[in-house]
Amino acid sequence: MEIGQYQPNLEGDGLRIGIVQSRFNEPVCNGLADACVEELERLGVSGEDVLLVTVPGALEIPLALQKLAESNQFDALIALGAVIRGETYHFELVSNESGAGITRIALDFNTPIANAVLTTETDEQAIARMTEKGRDAARVAVEMANLTMTLDQLSDDEEDEEDEDDEDEEERA
């Protein structure tokens, strides 16, 4: 049996990308953002089509993402942040709540969101991961923007076929 298969599309030309970056753990978050923006450019996304906003910390990322998603101006969004374990339970709270919020926004607004909020035990781990994770976020955003547009087109094609079937039935009646 032969099945249809979608091949990942990393062509960013014409895509509009919104980025929300935490300022907490700023050196790491700036490293994430630099790598992400460089990779978006490498993938063909124009600087004019990228909006980067900053928020105080990881817990504020979901609200900013929601506002960007509500605007319907972006094909994909990216969350950038760094939550580094400290001495208290706060690490788990921030990690879990920011991640859940990011996922909820993606599902509620049918908008792809690349989650590059690092959760690490140490500053050194975060620094070691920031460049590759920033690049990865750009690739995920572009790939998922293209995938969702393709899947949306499938839905539109199916609706068009249903409309044609309804018209045929009306003509026969």
From Swiss-Prot:
Highest taxon above the source species: Bacteria
Please note every region of biased composition (Acidic residues).
Answer: 154-173
Q: What does UniProt give as GO cellular component?
A: cytosol; riboflavin synthase complex
Q: In which pathway does it act?
A: Cofactor biosynthesis; riboflavin biosynthesis; riboflavin from 2-hydroxy-3-oxobutyl phosphate and 5-amino-6-(D-ribitylamino)uracil: step 1/2
Q: Can you supply a Gene Ontology BP term from the record?
A: riboflavin biosynthetic process
Annotated catalytic residues = 90
Q: Could you say which EC number(s) this protein's record lists? A: 2.5.1.78
Q: Which InterPro entries match?
A: LS, LS/RS, LS/RS_sf
Give the keywords, sorted: Riboflavin biosynthesis, Transferase
What's its catalytic activity? (2S)-2-hydroxy-3-oxobutyl phosphate + 5-amino-6-(D-ribitylamino)uracil = 6,7-dimethyl-8-(1-D-ribityl)lumazine + phosphate + 2 H2O + H(+)
Q: What class of enzyme is it?
A: transferase
GO MF terms on file? 6,7-dimethyl-8-ribityllumazine synthase activity
Location of the region described as Disordered in the Swiss-Prot/TrEMBL record: 150-173
Q: Does the keyword Repeat apply?
A: no
Q: Which residues bind 5-amino-6-(D-ribitylamino)uracil?
A: 24, 58-60, 82-84, 115
User: Where does the chain bind (2S)-2-hydroxy-3-oxobutyl phosphate?
Assistant: 87-88, 129
Q: Any signal peptide, and if so, which residues?
A: none
Describe the family membership recorded for this protein in Swiss-Prot or TrEMBL: Belongs to the DMRL synthase family.
General function of this protein: Catalyzes the formation of 6,7-dimethyl-8-ribityllumazine by condensation of 5-amino-6-(D-ribitylamino)uracil with 3,4-dihydroxy-2-butanone 4-phosphate. This is the penultimate step in the biosynthesis of riboflavin.
What's the name of the protein? 6,7-dimethyl-8-ribityllumazine synthase
- Organism of provenance: Burkholderia mallei (strain ATCC 23344)
